[in-house]
């Protein structure tokens, strides 16, 4: 019912604010560590060629749309066919025995709010059979609260369902911030925990939505 959901949401927000209070003494440290990390890590370009197809010999075609931040944008990969979307299209094609026609709309550094305002209006195609979204890292880095995160997610889903009412929407699992070796222990602790909270909120949100799904397994870099 609604009451357990309210209690759960209150608990999630409480955990977030508790984490925020713990991190207040760390904020100047996080700020300087973040700046140093940005200087140390080269700014990698996003992948080229944001559309393509796999296994054109199959009779049936599935149109795939991927939306998101750096992983979907193919940061550090030369072409999208060698990145997340290309690999996903290949897997789907082999399992479903279908020709996959794919298109990527993504930008490194974007939050869900950015995606709603800057990416969704650019999507001109009127028909997709599957939508896959990869978000969470930037919302955690900007210390977005669970309440605001879900509000932004709700808006994103609403915008997509207006344009693609019958298309299933899949959210990928959250980025493994706690395992990124470039990040310091304090960044791993604060941002890593927040990413996990946002992931749990997203999981709860998708439970009550028709044709909206979340893959909730926590990623480790060994996978």
Annotate each PLM feature.
Residues 1-65:
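N-terminal secretory targeting modules
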């Amino acid at each position: 019912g609604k009451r357990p959901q309210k209690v759960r949401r209150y608990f999630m927000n409480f955990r977030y604010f508790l984490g925020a209070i713990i991190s207040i003494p760390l904020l100047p440290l996080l700020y300087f560590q973040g700046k140093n990390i940005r200087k140390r890590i080269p700014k990698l370009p996003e992948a080229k060629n944001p559309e393509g197809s796999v296994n054109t010999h199959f009779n049936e075609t599935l149109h795939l749309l991927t939306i998101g931040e750096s992983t979907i944008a193919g940061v550090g990969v030369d072409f999208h066919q060698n990145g997340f979307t290309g690999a996903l299209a290949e897997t789907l094609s082999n399992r479903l025995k279908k020709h996959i026609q794919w298109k990527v709309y993504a930008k490194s550094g974007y939050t869900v709010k950015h995606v709603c305002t800057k990416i969704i209006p650019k999507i001109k195609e009127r028909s997709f059979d599957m939508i896959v979204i990869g978000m969470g890292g930037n919302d955690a880095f900007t210390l977005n609260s669970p309440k605001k995160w879900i509000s932004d997610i709700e808006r994103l889903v609403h915008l997509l369902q207006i344009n693609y009412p019958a298309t299933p929407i899949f959210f990928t699992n959250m980025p493994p911030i706690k395992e990124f070796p470039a990040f310091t222990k304090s960044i791993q602790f604060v941002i890593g925990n927040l990413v996990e909270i946002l992931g749990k909120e997203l999981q709860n949100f998708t439970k009550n939505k028709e044709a909206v799904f979340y893959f909730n397994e926590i990623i480790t870099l060994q996978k």
